[in-house]
Regions:
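Glycine-rich FAD pyrophosphate-binding loop
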Residues: 45-65
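Dinucleotide-binding Rossmann-like beta1-alpha1 core, especially the glycine-rich loop
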Residues: 73-152
């Protein structure tokens, strides 16, 4: 996992020094992937002094090797959530993921991040006829939950499928470009600091008076 299509597509991912001295902050975030940097972005906007620690260079792990899709469709997740919990739980999951797509879009717009964001339809397909009913039940359920999914039998894939569930209004982007944009937004106020090649080996609990 050394090569990354996304990292290779940009001139340079921003680099940062190693933490080699004691520092104080309001919040310390471990990991500078999309999750960690998104948390840092919102905290910085609130004026909270934040330090982000990354054991490698930014974008070298999960984010740099991601599928680059931004979607609320994760396999046949909603049937699983309904069966394991209930409809309300499944609906909350859907709404949270759909809101996340819009949050990313809003960050891109507000911070003027050029990261090739575009809305797309996302698909989960099957190649076995025995699984068609599972797909159709997922379509029915997700429509009940509030997304206009639909069933298809034809695709542009280079192999035959028996069917697929399509989720409209999903998205894709270049995660490396997005990370660079997030970083610029985080460090421009000097409220937050990022340190790479810094491994966290232990976390100690402390008494906090809030």
């Amino acid at each position: 996992m050394d090569k990354s299509l996304w990292i290779d597509s940009i001139d340079k991912m921003q680099s940062f020094p190693k933490l080699d001295e004691n520092k104080k902050c309001d919040v310390c975030i471990i990991g500078a992937g999309i999750l960690g940097l998104t948390c840092a972005y919102y905290l910085t906007r609130l004026g909270i002094n934040t330090i982000i620690l990354e054991k490698d260079e930014i974008g070298k792990k999960a984010t740099g090797h991601s599928s680059a899709k931004i979607t609320s469709q994760h396999g046949l997740m909603y049937s699983y959530l309904k069966n394991s919990f209930d409809n309300k739980y499944a609906k909350n999951y859907l709404e949270a993921n759909q809101k996340a797509i819009e949050n990313i879009k809003n960050i891109i717009k507000e911070e003027k991040i050029n990261c090739d964001f575009e809305y797309k339809t996302n698909y989960v397909y099957i190649t076995q006829k025995s699984e068609i009913n599972k797909i159709k039940k997922e379509v029915e359920l997700t429509n009940e939950l509030g997304i206009k999914s639909y069933f298809i039998t034809q695709s542009n894939l280079p192999f035959k499928i028996e069917g697929a569930i399509a989720f409209p209004d999903q998205a894709q982007f270049n995660p490396a470009k997005y990370l660079n944009g997030l970083i610029k937004s985080i460090i421009k106020t000097d409220k937050s600091k990022i340190y790479t090649n810094t491994t966290v080996t232990d976390v100690k609990k402390a008494n906090m008076n809030m």
